[in-house]
Amino acid sequence: MTESKGPDTPGGSAAPKKKRKTLLDRMRPYAIGVMAMVVVFGVSAVIGAHVRGKKDTKVSEPTGAVAAAQRPTAAPTDGASPSPTAAGPKLAIPVKPSAPVTVTVYEDLRSPDSKAFQEEYGAVFKQLLATGQVQFQYRLVTASDKSYGGTGALVAANAAACAQDQSRFTDFVDQVWKNQPTDPKDDGLASEKLMKKLAAKAGKIKTASFDPCIEQLDHEGWVDKSQQDFAAAGYGDVPVVEINGTVVKDVHTSLTPAKLRSQILKEAKRVVTLRTAPTNTPALAG
């Protein structure tokens, strides 16, 4: 009996059987594809984190920001102006600029003390603005984030700077005060959704530019710089008030709206007197 060699093939040998793919062989192309996607997304995340890290250090000043005012100390000579001069980084938001007296208010949008101060002194501030002799500069700080944890003060301050880009700082901050959590440990102001809602309530804020500004924290570096400058000055707790660069005493104890108004008007009178004082320039001989 002869041995069967199967179907006839050249040379009389049997055709090799096709090897069957295992489950691992069938899954290998998909596994490679998934791994490639993981690598791509991983690299993207690293790049994004790197860009975000770089962005945090950039000081992007909001539109109209100004440097700190300094106290006029002498009558004008040789063309020098007795008006408050400015120096240093532009960390203040001015309200009604170009006045003989500059009142600077350091405030933390998450701080109940800052909110209480604005509620108590807001009416007097409006009266003083109406005189045309006073401008206000607001410095936003974030000490409450360090005290209680979270980022509510930072997010709110950045959003206020975004509103300032559209000349809506005061209107937006008014909404922040109205919606500030009663407990400073509550980090509710860290919500981007809330910031967008407050912008809508403030009115006349274009979402096309405001929303990306808060989502990307465009002014985060500026807010951080303001806080660093405030901490380095050793002012203590907010609120802090300056009149032409001089710190007002007893803000947390015996100061009242009437007393502050009196101090501001006294400084305005002093500056006006400096402006009208005769110079020491000798008269030319006829």
What spans do the regions from the language model cover?
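An acidic, carboxylate-rich microenvironment
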Residues: 171, 193-194, 209, 259
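C-terminal cap of thioredoxin/glutaredoxin-like
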Residues: 2-59, 200-286
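Extracytoplasmic low-complexity, Pro/Thr/Ser/Ala/Gly-rich segments
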Residues: 56-123, 127-132, 138-140, 269-286
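A structure-centric signal for secondary-structure junctions around beta-strands
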Residues: 100, 156, 237-238
